[in-house]
Amino acid sequence: MAYGWKITSEYDNGEFKECSPVYGPSGIKDGPRQRLDADEGLRFKMYDDDGEKMASGKLIPDDHTTQFEPLDDYGEGNFGCTYIKYWQDGGWKIL
């Protein structure tokens, strides 16, 4: 896998809470991980079905990613997230 994501922040009832970074997917390659640690990547936020922001982070995509990977790999199972937004063209857009 040549893509990778990093959860940089978690939220509880919309309030920031401290967390250690979480990297994915399992088996993430060194290249994407190093780029994430250099603060590269596409910014995203994940939300639950009540519209509460649950986590945010960055994605290093490859030619095969759909950009749903952080949601599918981590957000749904760990936070109950149902949608993801990316920073595009000066604003947050639902994917």
Predicted regions located by residue number:
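Tryptophan-centered short beta-strand motifs
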Residues: 91-95
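Feature captures hydrophobic
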Residues: 24-28, 52-58
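Negatively charged, low-complexity tracts enriched in Asp/Glu with abundant Ser/Thr
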Residues: 2-29
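Acidic surface patches and DE-rich sequence motifs
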Residues: 11, 48, 87-89
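Acidic, low-complexity, intrinsically disordered interaction modules
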Residues: 54-88
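A short beta-strand micro-motif
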Residues: 40-49
